């Protein structure tokens, strides 16, 4: 918005040359981060008071850790604050004509809406289950598949009209069309190795990345500050990849696919980092507010969508290794418990408790130890992911 305003002012008043600074992506990214940070810090106390007045408190389940019982009643649905800061900051600082930022914003809001309904049912309607699993996955699938169908052609073309034309040609040709190499699965640490996916392969991969990332972040969000800091670190790292793939110079030099327009995603990533740090101010132990599903599902989906656009799905799995392991721990625990119950008549556990962060608490780690150690691991994994920029 401000970029368009600056460009318009320059056309009517050429002497306002200093407004050219708005054309620099790095400047706007810095401003987006600062704007989101300030919005989060200033609006945070009001949002928390409002949540308390509405009695939107986090219910603690009976089988939860004993040390967590004191958290009962802590305001939840604080993810609204994160989404508010991201939305306002991004709209102020990004190029409004950029379709990639719009699709990430819409996916984020879509998954945020799903999480909002889930949280509302839990804390307001007093339904301990919230949205039923099938219902939740249905709506996640709807949003994820719509995004995947748009992105499969959007990455190939720089015009929305051409995207629509490609989609219609795909339908008329019997759902068979070749995608350019840059739409393939990029293998990290390998020089210019990209496995072709085809339309169906791309759509399936995109769906799995977006929905999987969303639920993985949601499963990780179980301790004060545990999920938000890794989201900030992974999101910031993806912003670097967006900057590279959006630049014809850097992408050519680093042997990355050039995806025109993807650089603007740096604005969204910066806003996500700023809003995340602001939220951490209130979410650090002992937390004054929890993000809830409205925040966790939305942020996870945003990370997945950005990774797909910049063709870094595997790198996302590396940098977000904590999210991956947390999700796997739940799947393994459930699968093993059902298998042993069917075979031996009594269910057995692989972990003392799942997700994995609760297992470490059961092993004697304090909550703050688990959180900070997971942060350190994420920081190291992000460095590994960023090293793929050059180590190829």
Swiss-Prot record:
EC number, UniProt record: 2.7.8.13
Alphabetical UniProt keywords: Cell cycle, Cell division, Cell inner membrane, Cell membrane, Cell shape, Cell wall biogenesis/degradation, Magnesium, Membrane, Metal-binding, Peptidoglycan synthesis, Transferase, Transmembrane, Transmembrane helix
Single biological process term from Gene Ontology: peptidoglycan biosynthetic process
Membrane topology of this protein: Multi-pass membrane protein
Transmembrane portions of the chain: 28-48, 76-96, 100-120, 137-157, 193-213, 225-245, 262-282, 289-309, 314-334, 369-389
CDD domains associated with the record: GT_MraY
Major location category of this protein: membrane
Catalytic function, reaction form: UDP-N-acetyl-alpha-D-muramoyl-L-alanyl-gamma-D-glutamyl-meso-2,6-diaminopimeloyl-D-alanyl-D-alanine + di-trans,octa-cis-undecaprenyl phosphate = di-trans,octa-cis-undecaprenyl diphospho-N-acetyl-alpha-D-muramoyl-L-alanyl-D-glutamyl-meso-2,6-diaminopimeloyl-D-alanyl-D-alanine + UMP
Top class in the EC scheme: transferase
Cofactor list: Mg(2+)
Pathway: Cell wall biogenesis; peptidoglycan biosynthesis
Domain of life: Bacteria
A UniProt-annotated Pfam family: MraY_sig1
Location of this chain's protein in the cell: Cell inner membrane
GO cellular component assignments: plasma membrane
GO molecular function: metal ion binding; phospho-N-acetylmuramoyl-pentapeptide-transferase activity; UDP-N-acetylmuramoyl-L-alanyl-D-glutamyl-meso-2,6-diaminopimelyl-D-alanyl-D-alanine:undecaprenyl-phosphate transferase activity
Family: Belongs to the glycosyltransferase 4 family. MraY subfamily.
Purpose of the protein: Catalyzes the initial step of the lipid cycle reactions in the biosynthesis of the cell wall peptidoglycan: transfers peptidoglycan precursor phospho-MurNAc-pentapeptide from UDP-MurNAc-pentapeptide onto the lipid carrier undecaprenyl phosphate, yielding undecaprenyl-pyrophosphoryl-MurNAc-pentapeptide, known as lipid I.
Protein name: Phospho-N-acetylmuramoyl-pentapeptide-transferase
Gene: mraY
